[in-house]
A protein has these predicted regions:
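Structural signal for hydrophobic packing residues in well-ordered secondary-structure cores
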Residues: 15-19, 53, 76-81, 134-137, ...
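Function-dense linear segments that define catalytic or interfacial modules
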Residues: 80-172, 177, 182-192, 283-285, ...
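Internal maturation/activation junctions in enzymes
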Residues: 27-28, 147-169, 194-274, 344-345
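Alpha-helix capping and helix-loop boundary segments enriched in small/acidic/polar residues
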Residues: 2, 63-67, 77, 100-103, ...
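Catalytic alpha/beta core of large soluble enzyme barrels
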Residues: 116, 154, 158-159, 244, ...
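Active-site cavity-forming subdomains of large catalytic enzyme subunits
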Residues: 1-140, 163, 167, 213, ...
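A glycine-rich phosphate-binding loop feature that marks nucleotide/adenosyl-phosphate handling sites
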Residues: 27-35, 90-102, 167-179, 203-207, ...
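Catalytic or ion-translocation cores adjacent to nucleophile or general acid/base/metal-coordination motifs
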Residues: 1-16, 199-205, 212, 288-303
Length: 404
């Protein structure tokens, strides 16, 4: 079992303020007040929660406890640091980007925190249809072809695969959710002498990646038709990634086709961890910096030596996650997230050894708290694992790998 905690902006604002938060039983809330709390987000959730807190004050709800929101969030982070779990999902950021609000909400994320869409109990169950473009082996002028090919491959996969339950089959048929991701970003940056601090370059790369994946889905709609549930969706109202044509004039060619043909897939991009598949493809995993340029990883009966793929040619250009301030990682992922319609599997690595990030500097609990808060403020949708390094050893609890 890999639990996750789903939090709203309302809760996170109280975390910032150090204000009180009332814990309640959603079942009792529904029975007494008729409020289906798990299916609310944003303003509706905030208004409902005020009503719930009033009911608690009047004694109408008996299963309730008031705690300090900041202390509760710190407890969650402490548990995640110690065990690797629970994952943290930011419900409002996820649902603001949901193109299918007319059908329902996105209640949670998948096991690796990157793939999710509308779930309707008894009717629709999310399924992961994922593939990744290897940026370590793709030149910039090849990116459009690779993105279009990945979209086509995944759309074909929906038609040739039979999901194990009817709810998932309905989801595939009506929403045609896919997730094109990338791996080897650290290699891509190292080969070009770029850093994770180069936010403009990262923004430009993922804007192009997003454009080409969306174009691939629009071209498939021209060939095969839009996804069946497009009417009344964000796409049905003429918006791409929540923006209208007038708000994104530089994408004129895409909107010209989209306005006429629609889009084939209701979700198009999702960036998975790719921990195992990156080993097979000879690149770094996903979009994160490598833990180290060269290190031993314990697998089964012994240690396996790992090195970054281009150690000889570009070794000096690689940044090691074990020595990189995690606010830099959060800011880089935030630039990518602007252009990725679903999620990005982001883990945080905090080195607890002294003098790693700066002379006389040692990471403490406040640094981890500030980084998690920064992730929410920058609009990230989830935090996967939080890992810690002590005496050059990485403590971790592994789960998903490439199974999701």
């Amino acid at each position: 079992v890999f639990p996750q905690v789903v939090v709203t902006d309302g809760f996170m604002r109280r975390v910032e303020q150090g204000a009180a938060w009332t814990l309640v039983d959603p079942y009792e809330v529904k029975q007494v007040l008729g409020i289906d709390l798990p299916n609310l987000w944003g303003t509706e959730f905030d208004e409902a929660y005020e009503q719930i807190e009033e009911a608690v004050g009047l004694g109408e709800l008996t299963l309730a406890q008031t705690v300090n929101a900041r202390n509760l969030f710190v407890d969650i982070l402490e548990t995640q640091v110690e065990t690797g779990l629970p994952y943290i999902a930011f419900k409002d950021a996820i649902n603001r980007a949901n193109p299918n609000k007319h059908i329902g909400i996105i209640p949670s994320v998948n096991l690796c925190c990157e793939s999710f869409s509308v779930v309707v109990p008894g009717k629709l169950a999310h399924s992961c249809n994922l593939a990744s473009v290897n940026l370590a082996q793709v030149e910039d002028d090849e990116l459009p072809e690779m993105c279009h090919l990945a979209v086509r491959l995944l759309d074909n996969t929906i038609d040739v695969t039979t999901a194990p339950i009817e709810e998932a089959r309905n989801h595939n048929r009506n929403l045609r959710t896919i997730g094109v991701g990338v791996l080897g970003l650290a290699d891509y940056l190292a080969k070009r002498g770029l850093r994770y601090q180069d936010k403009r370059k990262i923004r430009e790369l993922f804007k192009e990646f997003s454009y080409q994946c969306l174009m691939g889905s629009v071209l498939l709609a021209k060939e095969r038709g839009s996804y069946p549930a497009i009417n009344s969706s964000e796409y049905g109202m003429g918006n791409i990634l929540g923006k209208s044509r007038s708000q994104r004039s530089e994408w004129k060619a895409l909107y010209d086709l989209f306005d006429f043909y629609g889009i084939r897939n209701s979700h198009v991009m999702a960036i998975a961890p790719n921990t195992s598949s990156s080993l097979i493809q000879g690149c770094t995993a996903s979009v994160l910096p490598p833990y180290a340029k060269f290190n031993a990883e314990s697998l089964g009966k012994g240690d396996v030596m790992k090195a970054v793929p281009f150690l000889r040619e570009y070794g000096d250009n690689y940044q090691e996650n074990q020595r990189l301030e995690q606010r830099i990682v959060v800011d880089a992922i935030a630039e990518m997230q602007k252009w990725v319609d679903t999620g990005i599997s982001m883990e945080l690595v905090f080195n607890l050894n002294p003098d790693v990030y700066a002379p006389n500097k040692t990471v403490d609990a406040s640094d981890i708290y500030d980084t998690a808060l920064r992730a929410w403020r920058r609009g990230l949708k989830a935090i996967y694992y939080i890992r810690t390094v002590k005496e050059d050893r990485l403590s971790e609890v592994d789960g998903c790998g490439d199974s999701c």
